[in-house]
Design a protein with these regions (language model features):
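A well-structured
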Residues: 1-236
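C-terminal, non-catalytic "cap/extension" segments appended to globular domains
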Residues: 70, 123-125, 310, 318, ...
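Short beta-alpha connecting loops at secondary-structure transitions
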Residues: 80, 295-299, 327-337, 366-372, ...
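Post-HExxH zinc-binding segment in Zn-dependent metallohydrolases
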Residues: 212-214, 323-324, 334-362, 371, ...
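Auxiliary, metal-adjacent structural segments of Zn-dependent hydrolase domains
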Residues: 226-290, 303-304
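Catalytic Zn2+-binding segment of zinc metalloproteases
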Residues: 309, 315-329, 350
Length: 515
């Protein structure tokens, strides 16, 4: 494989070469045959690892152009390249998954688990969606629809009909995909894709009920007070000034965090500018395998909330950066979304002692608004999650989808009033990006939020221990299950007993004290 790109220092100078997908498949097929013909663990292991190296380098090249596409750079060219990726990937992943199943069924499985951990075979189940020609075709169609959605969003489209048609077709294709793979519904497939092997629909339904019981009433009461919860302006007038403050914060947190930010800034692994064709209101962290580096994307316009969003994404990046230097396999550099979001959301709270650098004298207002926003989001995300479960479980017309959303919204977020005419015209279905891009992901922000609150409470009593537990958690990456990772970080199970109530109560009390 070609050498490292990082010798070129800045990301903007990194070379992109479209993967030769035919050659990638030929090499993986050769590896598959070597695995089948292996007469020793070493031979089998080497061929198995070579499959992973091919995928890792392919995805690395793909990620370079995908980042440029999201940033609106060389837009037409990068768009065409990403569309080619979407067409080619399913057949490559079908071969990858075949090799994974060979490894899972082989006599060398125990030795692989001893060397790399049992979690590597838990992830094999997630990739069932490439097992037959129908599913590969449907995956390609799904990717094309998501690309169509991104184009509409990049243009700032408010074309309700166009957005709805993408939404409607995605529901149909995903249900067909689940059926082609033998799942009872897309809900089951969606849970597998999101690595939710540790908890299922029963746990998430109980979680939603508890949020509705303990969080919704408090938020509704505070909403009635008519307080302006708009975020204060940030001190940083531009992205460069914001990055300087984040660098100072990370350097003070720890040597490891400072080293991470030094490399991020030296290689300019971020883009916070606004420009034509860049995704609107997008804050995200992309992962560059092979180089083991993240890339942060944002649209910074000087708002304090945007400063927090940016720190959130740098938290994702720090977790990936740390795990990639500790865990031997790329798929172990990230965990399930319910854990990954603990990494990033907790970094938002580690930001609190440094708020003087970000919002100056508005520190109290920032904390108040942050706590309020997160509590309100707990309720809103539960509403989205219940909507997702029902929209894939029932065949509903456009108006019926709107009526369903209104009913759910009234129960979780009664402060959000939806005009009657929007219901009648079928215009009030939720426009949440996660529904289109990553079904069943959104609730995992909430599940992570409970652990984040627990970290926050620990920070206030013992900040050193909180940071040590945080570093332990991110270093493990995805090498262990959800519950095992919580235990390693000394965090409670958010689904058991009175955990949710016990953790949320002091957060609500603090918010009331700041009103």
């Amino acid at each position: 494989m070609p050498g490292s790109n990082t010798a070129n220092t800045k990301f903007s100078t990194w070379n992109y070469t479209r993967p030769d997908y035919s050659e990638v498949k030929r090499k993986i097929n050769d590896c598959k045959n070597k695995m089948l013909g292996a007469i020793s663990y070493q031979m089998f292991r080497d061929a198995w690892l070579d499959v992973k190296k091919e995928i890792e380098y392919m995805e690395y090249q793909e990620e370079i152009i995908y980042i440029r596409h999201l940033c609106g750079i060389d837009y037409q060219y990068s768009l065409e390249e990403v569309e080619i990726q979407n067409k080619e990937e399913p057949s490559v992943y079908a071969l990858r998954d075949e090799c994974s199943r060979i490894a899972a069924a082989s006599g060398y499985r125990n030795e692989l688990e001893q060397e790399f951990g049992k979690q590597i075979f838990v992830y094999v189940e997630e990739h069932r969606a490439a097992e037959n020609p129908d599913s590969m075709r449907l995956r390609s169609e799904e990717s094309a629809l998501k690309m169509q959605y991104r184009k509409l969003m990049a243009k700032g489209s408010r074309d309700d009909e166009a957005l709805y048609q993408v939404f409607r077709k995605l529901i149909e294709i995903r249900c067909e995909l689940a059926d082609s793979l033998g799942y009872n519904s897309y809900i089951d497939l969606g849970y597998h894709i999101q690595r939710r092997g540790d908890f299922g629909t029963r746990e998430t339904a109980d979680f939603r009920r508890n949020i509705k019981k303990y969080v919704t009433p408090a938020v509704a009461d505070i909403k009635e007070k008519g307080i302006d919860f708009g975020y204060p302006p940030a001190l940083a007038a531009n992205p460069e000034e914001l990055i300087a403050s984040i660098v100072a914060m990370f350097k003070d947190l720890s040597y490891e965090a400072g080293s991470y930010m030094e490399e991020m800034t030296r290689k300019e692994l971020y883009d916070l500018e606004t420009r034509a064709n860049k995704r609107n209101i997008l804050f995200t962290c992309c992962m560059l395998p092979y180089e083991k580096l993240p890339f942060i994307i944002g649209n910074y316009t000087g708002n304090g909330m945007e400063a927090g969003y940016t720190v959130h994404e740098f938290g994702h990046g720090f977790a990936f950066y740390t795990a990639a230097r500790k865990q031997p396999l790329y798929e172990l550099h990230r965990s399930s979304p319910a854990v990954n979001e603990i990494h990033s959301k907790t970094m938002e709270h580690f930001m609190f002692p440094y708020l003087d650098m970000f919002v100056g004298e508005h520190k109290k207002d920032y904390i108040r608004n942050h706590l309020m926003q997160q509590l309100e989001n707990l309720a809103y995300r539960c509403a989205i999650d219940e909507f997702e479960h029902q929209m894939y479980d029932r065949h509903l017309s456009r108006v019926e989808l709107c009526e369903l959303w209104v009913d759910i919204s009234n129960r979780y977020t009664p402060w959000n009033r939806i005009p009657t005419e929007d219901i009648q015209q079928g215009k009030c279905w939720p426009r949440q990006t996660h529904i289109v891009e990553t079904p069943f992901y959104y609730i995992q922000y909430d599940i992570a939020q409970i652990s984040t609150y627990e970290f926050y409470l620990k920070m206030k009593s013992n900040s050193g221990q909180a940071w040590a537990d945080y570093m332990r958690l991110i270093g493990e990456g995805g090498s262990k299950s959800f519950y095992e990772l919580l235990e390693i970080a000394h965090l409670s199970n958010p689904f058991t007993g009175n955990t949710l109530e016990d953790i949320c109560r002091p957060i609500v009390d603090e918010l009331y004290s700041l009103l």
